[in-house]
């Protein structure tokens, strides 16, 4: 729990008053509540449906997550993403995309957030074959056999 406290406090401090919109599962929300972490810019809410979550992502300056799927969405949309893991289910998100892995290290999170807040985040690009043409390629393969 102490590490969660340090991560949350780092996010709040480094956000410098910018709103932190944090959809969290119940057990994480409860853990944060039990730690007594509050800030005027911290908005904790339950997980959101796909469309509203997509809206939130599109409006974000950056994303902090532990989800590989969220890192994928961020890479596809060109949104800076900080992943609180030492691995990624989709390595292309950090190899060529907008994702950076910082683990659960508050110091690494602080450095990444400093880079993000200064506007110096890596640009990233779409990984190969993330062009939205998958169905077209599948049809091509099926009709050529």
Roles of regions detected by a PLM:
Residues 21-23:
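Short beta-strand segments
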Residues 1-17, 28-145:
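Nucleotide-activated sugar donor-binding and catalytic core shared by glycosyltransferases
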């Amino acid at each position: 729990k102490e590490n969660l406290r340090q991560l949350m406090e780092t996010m709040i401090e480094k956000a410098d008053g910018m709103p932190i919109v944090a959809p969290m599962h119940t057990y994480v929300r409860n853990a944060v509540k039990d730690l007594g972490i509050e800030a005027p810019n911290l908005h904790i809410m339950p997980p959101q449906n796909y469309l509203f979550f997509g809206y939130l992502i599109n409006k974000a300056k950056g994303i902090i997550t532990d989800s590989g799927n969220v890192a994928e969405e961020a890479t596809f949309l060109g949104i800076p993403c900080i992943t609180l893991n030492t691995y990624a289910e989709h390595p292309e998100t950090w190899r060529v995309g907008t994702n950076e892995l910082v683990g659960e290290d508050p110091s690494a999170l602080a450095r990444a957030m400093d880079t993000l807040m200064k506007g110096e985040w890596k640009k990233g690009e779409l990984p190969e074959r993330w062009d939205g043409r998958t169905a077209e390629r599948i049809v091509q393969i099926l009709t050529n056999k």
